[in-house]
Amino acid sequence: MLKLFYKKRETDEDLSRMAWDLLETACLKEGVLHPRDRIIYGKNGKPYLEGNGLYFNLSHSGDYALCVLCDTEVGCDIQRVRKPRASVIDHWFSTKEKDYILCGGSEGDRAERFTRIWALKESYIKQTGEGLSRDLRSFCFAFEGEEPVLYLLSDSGTERVSGLAFYEQKLDGYACVCCFKKQLTSL
């Protein structure tokens, strides 16, 4: 089970509060009452719902808040599509990722590819619970057709990661990505 809930901000409403409110709404739909009272935190601060086999993750960017519920550990990210900055690409992206981002097309195409990779990276580090304690240069994404493939990078080589899946959705100038364990039964 993977369920996405998102809301576009209509006023100056606080996006973080909107994301937590989406969690309340999503949990109610799944029969979980008072989810904020059931939250515990992992070693790197990732919040979990205690005792019901339901996992969640929150994100927000620009005018959107996102909440994802899943029956496996999940990470999500929503990012407004933005122009890539050379300093960010040079510092946080692998050579293959840089080539993918800059491989031609219009400025808008490059912005979409940059934002896609950034959202994939964020969803992965949120799924593992490591967050930004994990160096974004310690892994990279490549693509088989349009499917993202995750590789861990180390001094001893490159290792393809199996067991994870990525769900991507474009949303009104935003990239939305969810990372979850493949044992998921349905979307």
Residue ranges of predicted features:
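Core catalytic alpha/beta fold that binds nucleotide/phospho-ligands
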Residues: 1-187
